[in-house]
């Protein structure tokens, strides 16, 4: 277990902080500690709910890059819920949900590039506009 903890701290660039109390860490470091706690259990699927909300842009990108590295290097599935689309292009696949008739529905599943083509947009940020103005057009039944 000790080796697993050490490897996890190293993979998340937290080795230098291992003796620091959590309340003294930055927001980005606290998020990485949260990820580390889950990784130590060695799950196949890691669920991250709004893992980047409230972070500065640098820390947000770092969390996204760490998530991608974990998925690829450790052969894990990382499921991340986010409303922030700035670094979403780092994801391998996207699941886009929309609200139609007061119920959440699947609108799209695919790569970021496929998302742009499907919604006929030039930036992922535009997905919200499409779904807010024409939700029924994109709901998959």
Regions found by a protein language model. Give the residues of each.
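ABC ATPase C-loop
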Residues: 38-39
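Conserved catalytic motifs of ABC-family nucleotide-binding domains
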Residues: 42
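Helical segment within the ABC ATPase nucleotide-binding domain
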Residues: 60-74, 86
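ABC transporter NBD signature
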Residues: 26
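ABC-family nucleotide-binding domains
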Residues: 56
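Topological signature of polytopic alpha-helical transporters
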Residues: 3-4, 18, 93, 97-98, ...
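Catalytic Walker B motif of ABC-type/P-loop ATPase nucleotide-binding domains
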Residues: 46-49
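Conserved ABC nucleotide-binding domain
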Residues: 2, 8-23
């Amino acid at each position: 277990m000790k080796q697993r903890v050490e490897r996890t701290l190293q993979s998340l660039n937290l080795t230098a902080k291992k003796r620091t109390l959590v309340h003294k860490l930055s927001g980005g470091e606290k998020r990485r500690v949260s990820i580390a706690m889950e990784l130590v259990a060695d799950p196949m699927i890691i669920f991250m709910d709004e893992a980047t909300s409230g972070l500065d842009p640098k820390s947000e990108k770092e969390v996204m890059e760490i998530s991608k590295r974990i998925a690829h290097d450790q052969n894990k599935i990382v499921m991340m819920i986010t409303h922030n689309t700035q670094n979403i292009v780092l994801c391998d696949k996207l699941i886009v949900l929309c609200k139609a008739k007061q119920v959440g529905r699947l609108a799209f599943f695919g790569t970021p590039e496929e998302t742009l083509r499907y919604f006929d947009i030039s930036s992922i940020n535009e997905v919200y506009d499409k779904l807010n103005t024409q939700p029924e057009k994109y709901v998959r039944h």
